[in-house]
């Protein structure tokens, strides 16, 4: 082969190598591919001192999803809210009237969903329709059949309290010792997966009269007549959804 032909062949081979496509650079990931969910809002209801809860015979029913309209974390920002989780942390103390007797009772705490509150918070008897003979035995209460479409029990918890005929400030004689009893009870519960949807009227307050659909009540009833006070807090985790 002549020198000129060999030279042309070498040049052609070189050109083939130089014209090969280079590997393309990895493409940058487009931002916004995954949308982060907004964190839950939190509302805390504090009950201590003047705001402690007094639990009489027959129990008490309080609205807890009291989200007033506003811009703070504990306010609703839209016309609809979803309550996902609730935490209750309380200290129950038997009152002086109950401590006069030796007694034992099983109390109950409920979370009750009200589909159509109608402007006023119900009483425990409105929800459970118990006869007067069962007023002191809340473990026997059931939602009345006529209102089972309106009231839904989301959670139900039991607790036991005791009294021994003495109040907490009494002191035993020097030659005696008194065994402890459950006149003071710590009560802690946390629950999730509630999915309570609340539709609000076009008002700014967070009372039961502002709710069109979907109130959530904390209901507490003492057992066997051991009335008491509750000191602590309820914390609700929710989101503002729907239209402004």
Swiss-Prot record:
<comment type="function">
    <text>Encapsidates the viral genome into characteristic twinned ('geminate') particles. Binds the genomic viral ssDNA and shuttles it into and out of the cell nucleus. Plays a role in protection of the genome from degradation, virus acquisition and transmission by insect vectors, infectivity, and systemic movement. The CP of monopartite geminiviruses is absolutely essential for virus movement.</text>
</comment>
<keyword id="KW-1140">T=1 icosahedral capsid protein</keyword>
<protein>
    <recommendedName>
        <fullName>Capsid protein</fullName>
    </recommendedName>
</protein>
<dbReference type="GO" id="GO:0039615">
    <property type="term" value="C:T=1 icosahedral viral capsid"/>
</dbReference>
<dbReference type="GO" id="GO:0042025">
    <property type="term" value="C:host cell nucleus"/>
</dbReference>
<keyword id="KW-0167">Capsid protein</keyword>
<dbReference type="GO" id="GO:0046718">
    <property type="term" value="P:symbiont entry into host cell"/>
</dbReference>
<dbReference type="InterPro" id="IPR029053">
    <property type="entry name" value="Viral_coat"/>
</dbReference>
<dbReference type="GO" id="GO:0003677">
    <property type="term" value="F:DNA binding"/>
</dbReference>
<dbReference type="GO" id="GO:0075732">
    <property type="term" value="P:viral penetration into host nucleus"/>
</dbReference>
<comment type="similarity">
    <text>Belongs to the geminiviridae capsid protein family.</text>
</comment>
<dbReference type="GO" id="GO:0005198">
    <property type="term" value="F:structural molecule activity"/>
</dbReference>
<dbReference type="Pfam" id="PF00844">
    <property type="entry name" value="Gemini_coat"/>
</dbReference>
<comment type="subunit">
    <text>Homomultimer. Interacts with the movement protein. Binds to single-stranded and double-stranded viral DNA.</text>
</comment>
<keyword id="KW-1048">Host nucleus</keyword>
<keyword id="KW-1163">Viral penetration into host nucleus</keyword>
<keyword id="KW-1160">Virus entry into host cell</keyword>
<dbReference type="InterPro" id="IPR000143">
    <property type="entry name" value="Gemcoat_MSV"/>
</dbReference>
<dbReference type="InterPro" id="IPR000263">
    <property type="entry name" value="GV_A/BR1_coat"/>
</dbReference>
<feature type="region of interest" description="Disordered">
    <location>
        <begin position="1"/>
        <end position="39"/>
    </location>
</feature>
<keyword id="KW-0238">DNA-binding</keyword>
<dbReference type="GO" id="GO:0043657">
    <property type="term" value="C:host cell"/>
</dbReference>
<keyword id="KW-0946">Virion</keyword>
<feature type="short sequence motif" description="Bipartite nuclear localization signal">
    <location>
        <begin position="1"/>
        <end position="24"/>
    </location>
</feature>
